[in-house]
């Protein structure tokens, strides 16, 4: 679960002022509440239970690649995919362990295989958008118009174990950067090719 927070709310927290409770259907202010009390409750719960996460909506909207379609109002439940109203969440993961190759010197990441998998995954996720039967026409229309996908990885810690790289090392951080740079670069290239 993630809670959407605005810069105006955070300003009210820092100044210990109330913030407006706005009806999202009408845009009318229906009350006020202490921003600091709400923020303290959110932070306490996150510390005690791990929930909720916090999403900074103003920041997300500054990076909105399709502002003509509307403002980002929420994310999927875990917060990794910002969504416009009526967009659907289309996520996929690549298992990095399946992209290791044993050599006489030890295990190595097969970058060519990973690149091919990234390209295939982008096509697969785009095909999911195409063949999915959405429960509402608005979801169908919005999802097909923005064609938003999210491609991530799993098995990173296991991959590091095979490679003999400590998870908490500078080399581990560098490997994470290299892998995700490849996923992002190739993923964007393939998305542009599809467009």
Q: What is the predicted function of each stretch?
A:
Residues 1, 117-140, 165-195:
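Internal maturation/activation junctions in enzymes
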Residues 1-111, 134, 138, 187-195:
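Active-site cavity-forming subdomains of large catalytic enzyme subunits
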Residues 41, 155-159, 175, 190:
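A general alpha-helix detector
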Residues 44, 93, 124-127, 158-159:
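Short, hydrophobic/amphipathic alpha-helical patches that form generic packing surfaces
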Residues 66-70, 148, 182:
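Eukaryote-specific, cytoplasm-facing alpha-helical/coiled-coil scaffolding segments in long proteins
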Residues 87-90, 149-155:
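Catalytic-loop motifs flanking and including active-site residues across diverse enzymes
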Residues 97-104, 160-168:
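Short helix-capping/linker segments at secondary-structure and domain boundaries
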Residues 134-153, 160-161:
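N-terminal glycine-/lysine-enriched basic segments
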